[in-house]
Structures are given as C-alpha cells and as structure tokens.
Amino acid sequence: MKLSENEASKLIEKLWFRHTDSTIIAVLQDYKTKEVLMVGHMNREAVFKTLTTGYVHFWSLSRKKLWLKGETSGHFQLVEDFKIDCDGDAMVFLVKSVGPVCHTGNRSCFYRNFSDLI
C-alpha cells in the first residue's frame, strides 16, 4: 500500500510526534495472522518514506538515523494497511514480511516468555 506524497504529507500533519527524538511508536503486525512482529520508532521522514514507498522505515534511536527495515538482511516489510491510534502518537502497520522480522532470525521479536527471563 502506498500513498501519494500529498496524501502522506497531509496525514503526517495529523500525527503527534511526542516520543523520544520527536517520534511516534510503530507496531508491525502480520497482515494475515495479526501476530505482533516488532515495535519501533518513526520520525516524520520514516513515516513519509513508509507511506510513499510501501516499505517500512524506522528512526533508529541509538544510531540517530533513518533505516529501511530489511536493508541489510533483505527481510523487507511490505505495508498492506495501517491504522492510527486515537491520540495520533502511534501507528500499527499490517505488513507482509519477506523473511523473519527479528534480528535474531525469529519470525517475531516477541518470541520470549517471561519464564525465559527469570
């Protein structure tokens, strides 16, 4: 799913970039199974690139730079649809994954149970 640059710009003006580094929270969810795959941060540029290219982009809080999810691994996340929360400070992207999402090689970043950590 892609929006025009004009549509993306209008939508971005309605968002509230209030989190660290002027970001919103971005949740990736499998578009078929609805499994939560990962959570990241997006600044205005990341949202714009995501909406206009159809490929998920994030803002790296640690590296302070934009990154295309899958640019190194080839495991791109293709946007099928998206939703915006009631406050406008978070988005859920329903995605089609090209390979595992997590850098560990797991399909989802949410693969650990609490018992694994205690």
Curated annotation (Swiss-Prot):
**Entry EC number(s):** 3.5.4.19
Predominant localisation class:
cytoplasm
* Cofactor(s) needed: Mg(2+); Zn(2+)
A GO molecular function annotation here is: phosphoribosyl-AMP cyclohydrolase activity
Residues annotated to bind Zn(2+): C86, C102, C109
Q: Which Gene Ontology cellular component terms are annotated?
A: cytoplasm
What EC class is this? hydrolase
Q: Which reaction does it catalyse?
A: 1-(5-phospho-beta-D-ribosyl)-5'-AMP + H2O = 1-(5-phospho-beta-D-ribosyl)-5-[(5-phospho-beta-D-ribosylamino)methylideneamino]imidazole-4-carboxamide
Give me the segments passing through the membrane.
none
Question: What pathway is this protein a component of?
Answer: Amino-acid biosynthesis; L-histidine biosynthesis; L-histidine from 5-phospho-alpha-D-ribose 1-diphosphate: step 3/9
Gene3D superfamilies xrefs: Phosphoribosyl-AMP cyclohydrolase
Complex formation: Homodimer.
Protein name listed in UniProt? Phosphoribosyl-AMP cyclohydrolase
